Amino acid sequence: KSIYGHSQTLFPIIQGGIDPDERLKCLNQMLPYAACGIAIGGLSVGEKKEPMLDIVELLGKNMPKDQPRYLMGVGKPTDLVKAILRGVDMFDCVLPARNARNGQIFTHEGVINIMNSVYANDTSPIDKNSSIDFAKTFSKSYLRHLFKVNEMFGLRIATLTNIAYYLDLINEIKNEINNNTLSLVHISEPTRHA
């Protein structure tokens, strides 16, 4: 049913910091407006990880199962996996693009800082297991060179490599959900995720 007389997607945002009672109170007040899904806001803003995940788990157990759950502003790969294991369906975050601008590249082998001198002569692919061709084609030394000379193409390569990594991770998780095999294995590989 349209609330405002026109078609819209409305996700009420559940607030309340890391206070479980305030979160549940807000959730109960917002449920009548949850026509399309529910957003979890106000997390990943400086609190420790465990209280954040405790709130996500609490809300995951109390939100409707038939609507998407959207965790706002959370973007580290390990946080995505942990939130998915607690029932979250959707995310948004600037982290892949922002970190790419600073030379941090998410790869299937782990996170690298392309500005480190170790990559100056590294002719191996940026990410040999990426789903995008140029991450498998261009070398780490070439990407580092582009960053050193402030060539915009380097930022594009880094950003798209990071976004591809995230898409690959989410697709892998989707496959594991479909096969009923999703577990904490993803987060037990500290070198793989930041």
Regions found by a protein language model. Give the residues of each.
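Acyltransferase donor/substrate-recognition loop-hinge adjacent to the catalytic core
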Residues: K1-I3
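Glycine-rich phosphate/ribose-binding loops and adjacent secondary-structure elements
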Residues: G5-I126
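Short amphipathic alpha-helical interaction patches enriched in hydrophobic/aromatic residues
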Residues: G42, K174-I177
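Structural signal for well-ordered, non-membrane alpha-helices
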Residues: G60, N171-K174
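Gly/Ser/Thr/Ala-enriched C-terminal appendages of enzymes
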Residues: V94-N171, N178
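Long C-terminal interaction/binding lobes of large macromolecular proteins
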Residues: L182
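Single conserved hydrophobic/aromatic residue that forms the stacking wall/gate
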Residues: V185-A194
